[in-house]
Amino acid sequence: MVRNPMASAVESTLKTKAQTSNLSFYYGAIQALKNIHLTLAEHRVTALIGPSGCGKTTYLRCFNRMHDLYPGNRYEGQILLYPDEVNIVGPEVDPIEVRMRVSMVFQKPNPFPKSVYENVAYGLRVRGVRNRAELDEKVERALRQAALWEEVKDRLASLAFNLSGGQQQRLCIARALASEPEIILFDEPTSALDPLATLKIEELMGKLKQSITILIVTHNMQQAARISDFTAFMYLGEVIESGQTNQMFDHPTNQLTEQYVAGHFG
């Protein structure tokens, strides 16, 4: 298997935000990920591509320990989160603490059955923020970061379900941003949206990466090429090749990668 590791490129020019080493993951007795090695560059967008069932979402969900919600799942290896080099899949690390540092936005918008305001404030309240002025400030900041404030500032008390699909997804992004995470995980965040809403989300990611590291799963090769700085191609639970996005798409070193980005299978 030929690889083009991102580690050397990232270490020489950029800070590392997360380093995956020898990561394997098991659903019970079934091995879903096999010895994953991947570096996430700080304040950059990394895209995970590959055919359905290759392990992209499984890998993504390791970063915020979502697999811990189901008994029998287990991790081997490590994902070090910098700068403190905490192994966020280590059994000694509290998943709640991990999720405060690593937020996630899902494929379909999933706002809570609450007001626009309370959707964003909910996580802050869970973390112990009670002061109304502080809540107001943090909610507004998150909504502004998600490019949604001007559209909802006069209907913060309205149910989130009254927003359009694209607005709901940006609300979910604001909810993820409210806890001031270091990494945001996006699992095909625009697959259920129309082209205009998709464009807004993509533009938003370009702004967010100035202060946050982003890892995104996408089946859309054009989207990966547009928005990501680095790309990793996965197949059958392994990272086959990874590197700078333009190199991955224009000059892949692995035949499987070349066939996939050319659309010969998927």
From Swiss-Prot:
GO molecular function, one term: ATP hydrolysis activity
Keywords from the named record: ATP-binding, Cell inner membrane, Cell membrane, Membrane, Nucleotide-binding, Phosphate transport, Translocase, Transport
Major subcellular site: membrane
Coiled-coil positions: none
Matches recorded under SUPFAM superfamilies: P-loop containing nucleoside triphosphate hydrolases
Entry keyword annotation includes Kinase: no
Enzyme type, top EC level: translocase
Protein location: Cell inner membrane
EC number(s) from the headed UniProt entry: 7.3.2.1
Superkingdom as given in the UniProt entry: Bacteria
Protein role: Part of the ABC transporter complex PstSACB involved in phosphate import. Responsible for energy coupling to the transport system.
Subunit structure: The complex is composed of two ATP-binding proteins (PstB), two transmembrane proteins (PstC and PstA) and a solute-binding protein (PstS).
Name this protein carries in UniProt: Phosphate import ATP-binding protein PstB 1
Gene (name only): pstB1
